[in-house]
């Protein structure tokens, strides 16, 4: 097999807050860094996808504990939904504070979310168009609150989907959006570094928004289905004067590894509900109902197709290379393996070392 020259730093570890306890996830990221991973993307949910053995960890708190226990690991949410339960100004403040504590090690992933994370808190679940519009405004507010001093005092007019806003001479922000209003707000503890902001997208309009406003795209598209969405993202970014080559394209393939195939297959069951048809548009927030619906409607073949189920870790090398060949810049490894510590160690010894050797060729 000819080796693709891929920097192993472009491989990251995915931490599933819905599937594991906070204590176990801390053990996993410490082991992952020790073995060679230097970045982690982690989910941000209120409810899990699955009722049986599910968890509901508060991701922002976990990131602080994880960053304290690691030395260089970068942490990014995948993704935080700025729809209802999180006000965008609070997101901006929280991640600015994280960056002050761990400068250069914090990133923010934004998305339109799922009903399971909003409806339990008393909110309605709006249509996709409304969720995207709210998310777009939230991204603008977050970026404007993070903005550096050179913008202070400059009045900005509405531009396309961008709502009227301005800063006064002391740097206080006024934002008049359709969904969010900011009145004389200022981060007194701004971020020390530029915090990368990414957006999860798979549809055309969301991808255009990602290209226009953010530093990168997070998508679950398979390599052979990615060209169209990349073209939309690149075009949107270029129209804003950005070089698409400077932006991230992020994938998160789901993997289950065990030398025993049946054990590897069984470990994928936890994610069956994420494969329900049009699940992001459904007003179902109860994990018990999601689990039951998944068992009734999602066939085993669909589960197998959605996950790389392997009994030999080397069988992951070619599929991962395919992501990079089509243009992905970073791949976060989302393992649902029956023994996670074993997976991390074997993956690092066989796969990370493979790509590390490839960079020396």
Residue ranges: model-predicted function:
Residues 1-361:
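Active-site-adjacent structural elements that line small-molecule/cofactor binding pockets in enzymes
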């Amino acid at each position: 097999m000819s080796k693709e020259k891929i920097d192993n730093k472009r491989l990251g570890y995915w931490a599933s807050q819905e599937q594991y306890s906070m204590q176990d996830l801390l053990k996993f990221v410490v082991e992952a860094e020790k073995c060679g991973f230097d970045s982690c993307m982690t989910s941000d949910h209120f409810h899990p996808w699955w009722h049986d053995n599910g968890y509901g960890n508060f991701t922002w708190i976990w990131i602080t504990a994880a960053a304290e226990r690691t030395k260089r690991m970068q942490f990014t949410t995948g993704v935080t939904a700025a729809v209802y339960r999180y006000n965008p100004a609070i997101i901006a403040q929280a991640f600015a504070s994280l960056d002050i504590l761990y400068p250069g090690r914090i990133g923010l992933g934004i998305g339109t979310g799922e009903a399971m994370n909003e409806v339990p808190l008393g909110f309605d679940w709006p249509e996709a168009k409304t969720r995207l519009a709210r998310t777009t405004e939230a991204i603008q507010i977050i970026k404007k609150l993070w903005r550096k001093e050179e913008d202070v005092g400059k009045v900005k007019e509405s531009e396309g989907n961008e709502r009227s806003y301005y800063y006064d001479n002391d740097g206080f922000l006024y934002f008049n959006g359709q969904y969010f209003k900011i009145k004389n707000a200022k981060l007194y503890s701004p971020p020390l570094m530029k915090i990368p902001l990414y957006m999860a997208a798979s549809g055309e309009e969301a991808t255009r928004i990602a290209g226009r406003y953010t530093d990168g795209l997070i998508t679950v598209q398979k390599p052979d289905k990615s060209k169209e969405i990349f073209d939309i993202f690149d075009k949107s970014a270029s129209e804003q004067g950005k070089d698409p080559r400077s932006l991230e394209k992020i994938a998160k393939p789901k993997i289950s590894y065990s030398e025993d195939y049946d054990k590897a297959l069984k470990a994928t069951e936890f994610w069956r509900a994420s494969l329900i048809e049009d699940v992001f548009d459904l007003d179902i927030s109860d994990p018990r109902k999601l689990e039951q619906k998944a068992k009734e409607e999602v066939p085993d073949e669909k589960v197998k197709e959605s996950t790389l189920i392997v009994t030999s870790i080397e069988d992951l090398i070619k599929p991962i290379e395919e992501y990079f060949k089509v243009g992905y810049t970073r791949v976060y490894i989302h393992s649902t393996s029956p023994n996670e510590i074993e997976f991390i160690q074997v993956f690092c010894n066989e796969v990370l070392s493979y790509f590390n050797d490839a960079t020396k060729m």
